[in-house]
Amino acid sequence: MNICKKSLFSHLAIRWISMICLLLFSVVALADPWPVAEPESVGFQKDKLEKVAEYATENTGTTGLVVVVNGKIIYTYGDIKQVSYTASCRKSVLSMLYGKYVVNGTIKLDETIGQLGIDDVQGLLPQEKEATVYDLITARSGVYHPASNPGGIPEDKKYERGVTRHGTRFVYNNWDFNVAGTVFTLKTGLDIYDALEQDLAKPLGMEDFDRARHKLSGNAEMSKHLAYYMHFSTRDMARIGQLMLQKGRWNGEQLVPEEWVVRSTSVVSPLNREFHCGYGILWWLLRDKQYPEQFKGAYSAQGMYGQFITVFPALNMVVAHKSAGNAKKKTTGGQYRHILRLIVEASLPKEEPPAPKEEEVVPDVKEVAPKMEEKNAE
């Protein structure tokens, strides 16, 4: 009897040890630390980057900042490991998840929400049901049904329903974005967060991703299409940007089709704003009058209160920025733009001080006098 008990105990112990090892292996397999480089090695000036910290500390609610150049971290500020809510950055990540399923035909962008059986608590008008999946992911559906979560259309700027034809007007509308999430699950059969884990987090080697933190959220009495909030650390946000910079390729694997990366970061809705030249497929497209060459082709995921993932193809650079929920204050879009300019300035060649002018040689008075006398003698 004792022998049997010992045998059973040994068997159970082996099973438990195996499970623990498997769990540890999965965690290690997920974690893939970033390589690090000195700013000078990639042509950036370290002293100028330090101005970012000075500005952020004195003026913003920045809690984490990562600057990646040529695939290596060259500068960090704050706690880059802290995982927190990333607000509307979720929409750009959803665009990335859409990529392969659009390219392989699983998701058809010309399908209408009526054909997909999409409806909502207040009911959708026949005209609204003509909006396509493409309209949803470009914020041009013309459907102004209340969203399950705040954000998007300002409270003081309501649009009349049934007036705007789909595809004709850009309105940043959370209803569109949330329904795009519903469509993703409906067409792929995948939970958004499971897809996030298997298609992005694991292959990217995210260091801080936690599937358990991710749950749909919103007021189902307002709309049955809930928001797919996402939570990342700043250093893992940088991985998302780096994947886009690399045209969707990571460690030899094409995680997001290159054609989708190009398409989603091209202008769909032109915008005449100081910092935005347009909106693509769930990505903001940037410009800057002060540094037009450095900002050429730049685009960004942007979330309320200071959540940003910005890609600079011209500089082979990614900037990830966060103002976490515990920040005493938030970071405005204007403040973030100033941070980006400080980083760009650090990439500019160091100006050489002008060469000192040769001092004019003043002749000695004794030397001048005889010459003057000679001249007078003539």
State where each predicted segment sits:
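Active-site Gly/Thr loop motif
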Residues: 208, 266-318
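Structured C-terminal helix/loop/strand segments within mature extracytoplasmic catalytic/sensor domains
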Residues: 301-378
